[in-house]
Regions:
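Short hydrophobic alpha-helices and adjacent helix-cap/hinge residues
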Residues: 1-294
Length: 294
């Protein structure tokens, strides 16, 4: 497997060390793996990784100084995510940061290496942690808790276009316990609001185009975009299709709104990566995942 090492100089300072000091630095270096669910060609995802690295450096852990960072990209491919997670484990990481859809792969790959997750809808439903306040096992992190936001997004969609009676729910075709649970919440919230829902699982841009085009052929519709690796990777396509067919849309990710999407209601991914850096720093300093609440 081709290995990709994410090397960054934090602070812009290069120091020439004596050989003995270099050896000591290498001995003290800790290994942190970063497992991303999308592709390395996505500048907004790269920005989230950089936010994590920058924050970690502020906390005293810098690449090339006392830290060895490895980044792997899953490219919204479950088999690749699994392989990348297994490779990070084989390389002997001290801590793994895993995003969204990669978390189950990381969790399956190791029960001993501490894992910090980000952008995960519900680690209880998966199930991964057992308890928010006292996580069980080798994993903890930061959840987006999408369930509590569904009703807000539907309400916002109604505010954008009061005549809406139908909603197209666009999501990844990849299924899981959390995916199904979130779909049920969307259906329940929509019924309570007097809206009908068309579920649109997709696995490529053609699916997105087809689903939006067919749905937009009838009036009084709106688009609700799920927060997952697939919609994140193809957010520009989704934004363009919604605009082309004049479909009011609400996105779960702020990054989609930044791509000229009409409106979003969700968390700040870069900020969550910064917060995750504090957990990684504590784990590197000896804390256990069970000490760090979700």
């Amino acid at each position: 497997m081709k290995r990709r090492q994410f090397i960054g100089l934090i602070g812009g300072v290069t120091v020439v060390w004596p050989l003995a000091a270099r050896a000591q630095q290498l001995e003290r270096a800790r290994r942190v793996g970063i497992l991303m669910s999308t592709a390395e060609t996505d500048p907004l995802e790269v920005a989230s990784v950089q936010a994590f690295i920058t924050e970690l450096a502020k906390l005293g852990w810098g690449q090339g100084r006392n830290l060895d960072l490895s980044v792997r990209w899953g490219a919204v491919d479950s088999q690749r995510m699994k392989a990348e997670a297994e490779e990070l484990v084989s390389l002997g990481m001290d801590v793994i940061l895993a995003k969204g859809a990669t978390v189950p792969s990381a969790h399956q790959a190791t029960t001993t290496i501490p894992i910090v997750f980000v952008s995960l809808p519900d680690p209880i439903v998966e199930p991964l942690v057992g308890s928010f306040s006292h996580p069980v096992g080798n994993i903890t992190g930061f959840t987006t808790y999408e369930y509590g936001l569904v009703g807000k997004r539907l309400s916002l969609l109604r505010d954008l276009s009061p005549r809406i009676t139908r909603v197209l729910y666009l999501r990844s075709r990849q299924t899981g316990v959390a995916t199904q649970s979130l779909l049920e919440r969307v259906m329940e919230s929509a019924r309570a609001a007097g809206l009908s829902v068309t579920d649109a699982p997709a696995q490529n841009p053609a699916d997105i185009d087809r689903a939006i085009q067919m749905f937009a052929s009838s009036p009084d519709g709106g688009l609700l975009v799920a927060f997952d690796a697939f919609t994140g990777m193809h957010r520009q396509v989704i934004v363009e299709m919604a605009s082309r067919y004049r479909l009011p849309a609400v996105y779960a990710s702020r990054k989609s709104a930044g791509n000229d999407g009409l409106c979003s209601y969700g968390f700040d991914q870069d900020q969550q990566f910064r917060e995750a850096a504090s957990y990684v720093a504590r784990l590197l300093s000896g804390s256990k995942p069970s000490d760090l609440p979700v």
